[in-house]
């Protein structure tokens, strides 16, 4: 272990999903690389839920608490059901992911996790990066992987995905929404956001994740989303005679925006900040796992980290999609509904997960309002003209 003013091989700034995933891979491979993770939080709790379609096996597969081969959308009393036998939609427990990563890392003599510490500034020289910490210490690292959340403001056409959710156990008679399948989007047509929807996952024993989500140009106020979540529960659960016990809660704001340029020659951006999050959906966990595998392999072979894979065409399509959603002559929830209703499910899953095959594009876009997309593309066709 080397810290203070002594040189290390790799500093990982931010020990959330991406930072822990990379460090756990290195520890599992018995890497001798000297690694320090710098994380502001003092400890880990069940603070979030990671979900998405599992396209390949991954390191944390045994941390899922539920998975489904079928899912649903709901709009104006209609229900749309879709399925994939190839790609299950899985829900992962944050505490299980954290515990597995921390156990794996603790078995390494060359990896140190510094909790309750922040990196305040850095200076890059020819052969190293010097990092100042808020505890007065310094790290000198050959390479840096920066996974900390982006701080920059976002501009049109980019959006915020804001959400407030609870995991609750119902008590009483069966309510109208109680199903064994995940409800990915229950559109709330009377809400002020560009798109508002309920996201509901059944986790067993009449326990559910209830999440109120909004896509909008500005961060939504948490108290407003909380109010709408409670109103929804009152309409659909309380009126059916149910009470519920809140087990935990989660909230967040995801920037649905183009990623920043690479940090520098010796600083690699990773996680959502580096491009692992799909702009148009917010899904990130499984892409982070793919990156962690690839980055760990490169570090073990060459001693040098790499960032997430970039797909400029997908980024362009995401920008075009978000621009169309914000047209005054478009009903965004109708576009989202058509996307799921008209697309071949496996192709759509690969597309939404950021891993489309060449033959997936047409099965995905054929059901969308072509005239709106063509008109929007004609004005904004230069690849990704807008500012990050």
Task: Tell where the protein language model's regions lie, with residue ranges.
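N-terminal Rossmann-like FAD-binding beta1-loop-alpha1 element of flavoenzymes
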Residues: 2-36
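Glycine-rich, N-terminal phosphate-binding loop of Rossmann-like dinucleotide-binding domains
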Residues: 15, 148-149, 271
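Predominantly flavin-linked oxidoreductase catalytic cores and closely associated redox partners
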Residues: 25, 108-240, 244
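N-terminal FAD cofactor-binding segment of flavoenzymes
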Residues: 25-78
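Flavin (FAD/FMN) cofactor-binding and adjacent substrate-gating region
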Residues: 57-85, 104-107, 121-126, 193
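Helical element adjacent to the flavin cofactor pocket in flavoenzyme catalytic cores
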Residues: 91-114, 236
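FAD/FMN-dependent oxidoreductases across multiple families
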Residues: 118, 190-192, 213-295
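C-terminal helical "tail/cap" subdomain of flavin- and related membrane-associated enzymes
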Residues: 293-388
């Amino acid at each position: 272990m080397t810290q203070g003013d002594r040189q290390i091989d790799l500093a990982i700034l931010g020990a959330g999903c991406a930072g822990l995933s990379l460090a756990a891979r290195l520890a599992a491979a018995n890497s001798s690389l000297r690694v320090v993770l710098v994380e502001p939080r003092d400890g880990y709790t069940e603070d979030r839920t990671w979900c998405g379609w599992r396209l390949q096996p991954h390191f944390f597969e045994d941390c899922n608490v539920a998975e489904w081969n079928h899912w649903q959308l709901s709009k104006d009393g209609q229900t749309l059901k879709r399925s994939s036998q190839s790609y299950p939609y899985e829900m992962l427990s944050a505490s299980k992911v954290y515990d597995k990563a921390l156990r794996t890392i603790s078995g390494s003599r060359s990896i140190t996790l510094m909790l309750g510490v922040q990196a305040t500034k850095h200076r890059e020289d020819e052969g190293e990066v010097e990092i100042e910490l808020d505890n007065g210490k310094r790290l000198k690292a050959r390479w840096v992987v920066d996974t900390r959340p982006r701080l920059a403001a976002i501009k049109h056409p980019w959006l915020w995905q804001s959400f407030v959710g609870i995991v609750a156990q119902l008590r009483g008679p069966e309510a109208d929404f109680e199903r064994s399948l995940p409800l990915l989007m229950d559109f709330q047509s009377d809400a002020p956001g560009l798109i508002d929807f309920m996201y509901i996952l059944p986790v067993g024993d009449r326990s559910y994740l209830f999440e109120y989500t909004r896509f909008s140009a500005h961060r939504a106020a948490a108290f407003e989303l909380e109010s709408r979540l409670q109103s929804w529960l009152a309409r659909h659960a309380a009126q059916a005679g149910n009470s519920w016990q809140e087990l935990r809660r989660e909230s967040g704001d995801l920037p649905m925006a183009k990623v920043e340029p690479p940090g520098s020659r010796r600083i690699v951006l990773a996680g959502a900040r580096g491009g692992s999050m799909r702009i148009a959906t917010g899904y990130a966990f499984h892409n982070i796992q793919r990156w962690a595998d690839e980055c760990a392999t490169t570090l073990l072979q060459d001693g040098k980290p790499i960032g997430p894979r970039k797909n400029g065409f997908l980024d362009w399509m995401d920008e075009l999609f978000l621009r169309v959603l914000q047209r005054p002559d478009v009903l965004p929830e109708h576009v989202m509904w058509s996307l799921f209703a008209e697309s071949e499910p496996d192709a759509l899953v690969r597309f939404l997960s950021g891993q489309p095959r060449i033959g997936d594009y047409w099965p995905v876009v054929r059901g969308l309002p072509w005239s709106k997309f063509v008109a929007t593309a004609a004005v904004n066709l230069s690849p990704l003209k807008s500012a990050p």
